[in-house]
Amino acid sequence: MKDLLNFLKAQHKTEEFDAIKIGLSSPDMIRSWSFGEVKKPETINYRTFKPERDGLFCARIFGPVKDYECLCGKYKRLKHRGVICEKCGVEVTQTKVRRDRMGHIELASPVAHIWFLKSLPSRIGLLMDIPLRDIERVLYFEMYVVTEPGMTDLEKGQMLTEEEYLDRLEEWGDEFTAKMGAEAIKDLLGSMDMHAEAEQMREELETTNSETKRKKVTKRLKLVEAFIASGNNPEWMILTVLPVLPPDLRPLVPLDGGRFATSDLNDLYRRVINRNNRLKRLLELAAPDIIVRNEKRMLQESVDALLDNGRRGRAITGSNKRPLKSLADMIKGKQGRFRQNLLGKRVDYSGRSVITVGPYLRLHQCGLPKKMALELFKPFIYSKLETRGLATTIKAAKKMVEREEAVVWDILDEVIREHPVLLNRAPTLHRLGIQAFEPVLIEGKAIQLHPLVCAAYNADFDGDQMAVHVPLTLEAQLEARTLMMSTNNILSPASGDPIIVPSQDVVLGLYYMTREKINVKGEGMYLSGPAEAEKAYRTKQAELHARVKVRITETVVDEDGNSTTETKMVDTTVGRAMLWQIVPAGLPYSIVNQKLGKKQISNLLNEAYRKLGLKDTVIFADQIMYTGFAYAALSGVSVGIDDMVVPPAKYTEIAEAEEEVREIQEQYQSGLVTAGERYNKVIDIWASTNDRVAKAMMENLSSETVVNREGEEEQQESFNSIYMMADSGARGSAAQIRQLAGMRGLMARPDGSIIETPITANFKEGLNVLQYFISTHGARKGLADTALKTANSGYLTRRLVDVAQDVVVTEHDCGTHEGVDMMPHIEGGDVKVALSELALGRVVAEDVLKPGTEDVLIPRNTLIDEKWCQIMEENSVDSMKVRSVVTCDSDFGCCAQCYGRDLARGHLVNQGEAVGVIAAQSIGEPGTQLTMRTFHIGGAASTAAAENSIQAKNNGSVKLHNAKFVTNKDGKLVITSRASELTIIDEFGRTKEKHKLPYGSLLSKGDNDAVEAGETVANWEAHTLPIITEVAGRIQFVDMIDGVTVSRQTDDLTGLSSSEVTDAAARPAAGKDMRPAIKLVDEQGNDVMIPGTEMPAHYFLPGKAIVNIEDGAEVGVGDTLARIPQKSGGNKDITGGLPRVADLFEARKPKEPAILAEHTGTVSFGKETKGKRRLVITRDSGEVYEEMIPKHRQLNVFEGERVERGDVIADGPESPHDILRLRGVHAVTQYIANEVQEVYRLQGVKINDKHIETIVRQMLRKCTITHAGDSEFLPGEQVEYSQVKIANRNLEAEGKEPARFERELLGITKASLATESFISAASFQETTRVLTEAAVSGKRDDLRGLKENVIVGRLIPAGTGFAYHQERQAKRAEAQEGPSAEQATDNLAALLNAGFSSDE
């Protein structure tokens, strides 16, 4: 018996492994896998249904059809296992060996493997340096190739047509050999000397100058080196033996009616075997060459079809005209092996049903229908019944359960107690889409769900279904309880805000409860506490909204956790005092002493979590919900048509607007305004009218007049149902009420442009036919968009997860001093996001000093929590350096200090947390809320007047940043630098506003001057770019010849004349090389120098510049010499929403990107070509850099101006690749983070920056080697950044020269495919290409990421699996050291003793 158990144990023993290697298999290797050669194309005998011998299903090769029984039936039963029957040759064993025993086919002629031939770039072609077309001609028998030139003038690898071959044959006889077919290619590959090739190419690389040649050689060199390193032999890309898949993986299933369903592979194999056998016979018969050749070609084609059908030529089709599914099709695509069976599987012990509300449940509970529970927990019930002795066997237990005896229900109750179940709602967009609950048995057939978790699941009760899963093992139950229980997931992993937030009814109830009303019963009472307030309310002595004074006792918990109580009289209402009863101790009364809307309630829960911890918050959340539902029911809020009050002012407003539109129409007809201006103006008029009507309506709805106790009239907030719903945030918004009671307003066409006739009616008044038609027009587009959006958003999430899946927190601290600089987000005059909000949950990278002193306020490596945020606010810190995932120094994954706080848990992130996947989910999940459309700046959307001044919005002082300026004769400052910024700082030194200062602005305030709110600080001309002189002197024109380089115009009205510089292209031949300029001279006619430099004050004039001053005039410092008219930035569509986010993460180059300065230096312009200008930057070292710029681009720089590397030379959207190259990693991180946040902020979605940074880290994981140093890398090769870091560390330790490199920014799709792990890349996209490349270079996958481990079926190295993997590696390290000699002796003795004692 014992050996039987051991035998059964040995049946499913899995090998422990740490890596997977892929490579090319040699013919001998294929033969060694094989259990015999398949010689016949037959499958099974159609009469006996037994497999044919030597056929595709042969039992002798692949194993028995029935467990422990040979084919002829001579040996049956377990006792004969391992015997090989002498009659039929079948081994007696389990039938499951038919799943893993392979066969093989000996090919009569070699065949090229199509993946290495046709998967671009063709590996065979690249290796032999012969174009793919020629190789195909040889393989498919259209041409000869010379394999041995002998003493002739032919070259090895030369192609010959049939005629040429025959000619040469006559000329040289058998001096040389030329062959066709795969055999020829095999000979050529076999005769290549890899090492010699590599040497030769290395020399070529050093000598060649042409870039294209270098690229080509590098590519080929990499391939050759891969072959050398991996030990693959190039000959193996040509098959001489074909492996045959085990038969149970390509089954033949009998259908009823005597027909068979078969896998397509059997058809494909049959074809190969038939052609192979025919070829063997033809070769034995010595058939004519042409027939053999044709057969060989057909064999090649049939093997191609088996490996990858349809890759070359037309796909082979089956009987029903459907292309056959080849081996390659089995693994790729959504239905392929990787994505269908390895990454997502169907599971047992699960059920699904419709969900309904469970308002009486606690937060950790869900209602589970009894029927469902009984089915799901069957095994547990059976075992309980048996251990209790209520059933003798499992079968009896099964009968009891089927009869549903009373005792079964009792046992079900026991089994379910404290056994959590998982609830999941598809689509699972983030990790909160699966949570654990304790089941409560209920009657009925619907699952009951706690209302507060709906937000996390994005569920509602209009027919949504949910799936239930049962965690079976103890470990699984433990994880479900500690990690996935709904009570442990109160905060959203995306933003760290509470996600268990009441909505709708609950909000309405609490809002109603905390409102106040003037002069109702009980006003002015003095109450001794919340309990008495409740008594007064219950006995109808006071109304819920009555203003009263109540004695309130607060508990205050200080830093050290000591609590003190304070009692005071508070002006409040009866409802608020009653609500105070459920608020846990430790929160201030002020937090409920206000009208509670959705925002306030969210804040209340957040405070509770931060101050009181998890347990109290959960209990509080439940209480809030029960209370909210109760008072919502009591409030009796409903919607009636009379609640929508149309403001009387509406009709006059509309009449006025129609009058204005009529005026503009008249102006248009008389030609005073253009069609575009008319359209924009009309839309502006209607948009502002709509706003005014809406304002009047809201004022009307939101307040009512009442009589107070003194008998005077007073305004109070209205108790109008619709207004209360919107004001509390329960349902609806001002925009929707506007359509009900104001006017519907402007509608959009499906393409996003705005229809200029608005709908002046509202829904209460009703729409006429035309209005209805206009409103359906844009509304249908919305529905179509939603469907597209979901698919697109899902695909974005998939790409994000794929790129970030291997970012796991692997260590506590990587020790880096790097980080990113944090500043508050300021746009114009508003602080959009405060610094404390940005820094919350981050770790400080460098000591933060107290502003204005050298004292350390926050030491390095401090995790910024709410307490520190307060200290920062108090000390008005306005910038700090925090650690970031992008700058983390860990080789694999990232470290806890660089990541900072785990947003969903509120403490420093744990090791093993899969932060990459969380980042991907956090960015992808709100994707469905983003819009699909590109915003047309049409009319009201955003035609802000061009700015031409800065007005201060706050009191404070002015600060100028990288500004150069001169003071003009009026004592104003004139800005003469490009990228200047002006900030306004309050008395604590905090930045309040940030404005861009264009070149030529006039400042009325200097640096550090005080400014008051509302003052104008700077102004400039909006549509012209001035050229300003920095010195005083007399003007002298250079090369300004009338009619050649300039044209003069005199204004008829004013009589003033001005000269306009002609574009170089439009000048007559004489003026082509002239460069018009203005130079400044002193009285004697000598050049005036620009102060502080050796450069004369020369101002070159670009084309289109207008000069208003005369030659010889005197000018002062800061005067304008010339003006260049600027085109106004026409209506560009800005891509918004999802497409914009996708563009950013795919790192796509914009159409016309901004041109940035490649170097720091001085700008000048060189010789122009037909359509381009030549921009020259002279560096301080004297080196010259030139760039050609198209003429139509408007440049921001003048001749002789200094630029810094990375400065904008021509405006446009910036390309992230340029930012990375010129401004570095920090700048590109900031750029992508800000741009992505911009899109999400518009939709009101909060995402923490660190998620975006995590993705950016993955986009930056490759770099290009610029100089190899002493490393193994090739210049120009793309390598994983971590590899270079490790290599350089080792080189530096040995005192050698490290490699130099440039970081690369890859889009997320590219980055996923460029990952180290070929398993992960293959399961993402382009499976064939990835696997081909991996096989050729003999790649090894170390299974570091999550995806690879899921695919090979191991625990993932994250979360609880992280510890498991660490322990395993430690054990292995120990085992490798091995036991000492004494230990080994002891072990042996112990074993022998144990053996003796057991036999007695």
UniProtKB/Swiss-Prot annotation:
Binding site for Zn(2+) 1: C70, C72, C85, C88
Cofactor dependency: Mg(2+); Zn(2+)
Annotated Zn(2+) 2 binding sites: C814, C888, C895, C898
Cofactor remark: Binds 1 Mg(2+) ion per subunit.
Catalytic activity: RNA(n) + a ribonucleoside 5'-triphosphate = RNA(n+1) + diphosphate
Top-level taxonomic group: Bacteria
Record-linked InterPro entries: DNA-dir_RpoC_beta_prime, DNA-dir_RpoC_beta_prime_bact, RNA_pol_asu, RNA_pol_N, RNA_pol_Rpb1_1, RNA_pol_Rpb1_3, RNA_pol_Rpb1_3_sf, RNA_pol_Rpb1_4
Enzyme category, top tier: transferase
The entry's keywords: DNA-directed RNA polymerase, Magnesium, Metal-binding, Nucleotidyltransferase, Transcription, Transferase, Zinc
HAMAP family to which the protein is assigned, alphabetical: RNApol_bact_RpoC
Subunit structure: The RNAP catalytic core consists of 2 alpha, 1 beta, 1 beta' and 1 omega subunit. When a sigma factor is associated with the core the holoenzyme is formed, which can initiate transcription.
Record protein name field: DNA-directed RNA polymerase subunit beta'
Species the sequence originates in: Vibrio parahaemolyticus serotype O3:K6 (strain RIMD 2210633)
Taxonomic classification: Bacteria, Pseudomonadati, Pseudomonadota, Gammaproteobacteria, Vibrionales
